[in-house]
Regions:
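Cytosolic, membrane-interface loops and tails of multi-pass inner-membrane proteins
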Residues: 2-14, 71-92, 189-217
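Multi-pass membrane catalytic core of lipid/isoprenoid biosynthesis enzymes
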Residues: 81-122, 212-236
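Interfacial loop-to-transmembrane junctions
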Residues: 256-286
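Intramembrane alpha-helical segments
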Residues: 94-165
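Small-residue-rich segments of transmembrane alpha-helices in multi-pass membrane proteins
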Residues: 30-34, 85-86, 148-165, 214-215, ...
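Membrane-embedded alpha-helical segments that form the functional core of polytopic membrane enzymes
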Residues: 31-73, 81, 122-133, 173-183
Length: 295
C-alpha cells in the first residue's frame, strides 16, 4: 500500500523533504561554492555574506532537485538505484514536491538578491532553471549529450561563490566552472556504464545506451584530457599557488589513468568503470581542497 495518505510521523515527513533536495549533491555544490569564495578573497571572506550565500545556494540546488524528482518520478520508480526516493515510495505527494521545489527556488532568489548581491541571485536563478528545466525537462530524455550540456548546472555554484564575495566574474571562476563541466561526463558516464541495464529499462538515453560502451569510454578519456588542461590553466591565472599545482597534477594523472584503464577493459566488464567513478569523487574533493590550501 502506498504511504501517501497513511500515517507518517513528523520526523518521517521532514526526512522525506530533505531527501527531495538530494543532500549529498547539495553538500558537494556547497563545498565547491565555498572553495570559489575562499579563493576569490584569498581567505579574507565576509563570513556573514558567505552564510547567506550558502543558504541561497542550498535553496536553489534543493529546489531544482525537488523539481527533478517530481518530473522524473516515473523513471525513478523503474530504476533500482532510485526506487527508494520519497515520491516513488509514496512518502510525498508529487504535487506537494513540485510546490516545494518552486518555493525553494523563489526563496533562493530573494535571499541571494537581498542579502548577498544581484549578480549572485541571477546566477542562482540561472542554475535553478538550468537543472530543473533545461536538463531535467529538455535534455535528459532526449539526447545522449544530456549530462554534457547539463553539466553546467552542477558547475554554477563556483560562479555563485565567486560572485557572492566579489560582485564580479573573471577568468579564474570561469576555469573553475569548466573544471566541473569537463569532470561531469567521465564521472556520470562511469556510473552509467555499470548501471546501463537500469537506464535502458527506464528509456533514458544515456551515452552507453545510445552510442555503446566503446564510444562512451573514448569520449570519457577526451573529457578527462580537457579537464587536465583546464585544471592546470587555473594556476596561470594566479588565483591559486604552487601548492595547488603540486596536488592537482598527480591527481589529474591518477584520474586520467583510471579513465584510460576503463577504456581498455572489455565492454562487459565494469571494474575500472567503478574505480573511475570512485576516483572522480576523490578528484573533485582533492582538487577543490587544493585550491583553498594552495591559494
Amino acid at each position: 500500500m502506498s504511504a501517501v495518505g497513511s500515517y507518517r510521523s513528523p520526523l518521517q515527513v521532514i526526512r522525506a523533504y530533505c531527501e527531495l533536495t538530494k543532500p549529498k549533491i547539495l553538500l558537494m555544490l556547497a563545498f565547491t561554492s565555498f572553495s570559489a569564495a575562499l579563493v576569490a578573497t584569498h581567505g579574507s571572506v565576509d563570513f556573514a555574506k558567505l552564510l547567506f550565500m550558502f543558504i541561497g545556494t542550498a535553496l536553489s540546488s534543493g529546489g531544482a532537485a525537488a523539481i527533478n524528482m517530481w518530473y522524473d518520478r516515473d523513471i525513478d520508480a523503474v530504476m533500482e538505484r532510485t526506487q527508494g526516493r520519497p515520491i516513488p515510495r509514496g512518502m510525498i505527494d508529487p504535487e506537494k514536491a513540485f510546490r516545494f521545489g518552486l518555493l525553494l527556488g523563489v526563496l533562493s532568489f530573494v535571499v541571494l538578491y537581498v542579502l548577498v548581491n544581484p549578480l549572485t541571485a541571477w546566477l542562482g536563478l540561472a542554475g535553478y532553471i538550468y537543472y530543473a528545466v533545461i536538463y531535467t525537462v529538455w535534455l535528459k530524455r532526449r539526447t545522449p549529450q544530456n549530462i554534457v550540456i547539463g553539466g553546467g548546472a552542477g558547475a554554477m555554484p563556483v560562479l555563485i561563490g565567486w560572485a557572492a564575495v566579489t560582485g564580479t566574474l573573471s577568468l579564474a571562476p570561469i576555469l573553475m566552472f569548466l573544471i566541473i563541466f569537463f569532470w561531469t561526463p567521465p564521472h556520470s558516464w562511469a556510473l552509467a556504464l555499470y548501471k546501463n541495464a537500469e537506464y535502458t529499462k527506464a528509456l533514458v538515453p544515456m551515452m552507453p545506451v545510445v552510442k555503446g560502451p566503446r564510444s562512451t569510454k573514448r569520449q570519457s578519456v577526451v573529457y578527462t584530457v580537457l579537464l587536465f588542461a583546464t585544471s592546470i590553466a587555473l594556476y596561470f591565472t594566479h588565483a591559486v599557488g604552487a601548492l595547488y599545482l603540486v596536488i592537482a597534477v598527480p591527481m589529474n594523472v591518477v584520474f586520467l589513468y583510471a579513465t584510460i584503464k576503463m577504456h581498455q577493459e572489455a565492454d562487459d566488464t565494469f571494474v575500472w568503470a567503478k574505480r573511475t567513478f570512485f576516483w572522480s569523487l576523490v578528484y573533485i574533493l582533492v582538487v577543490f581542497t587544493a585550491m583553498m590550501i594552495g591559494m
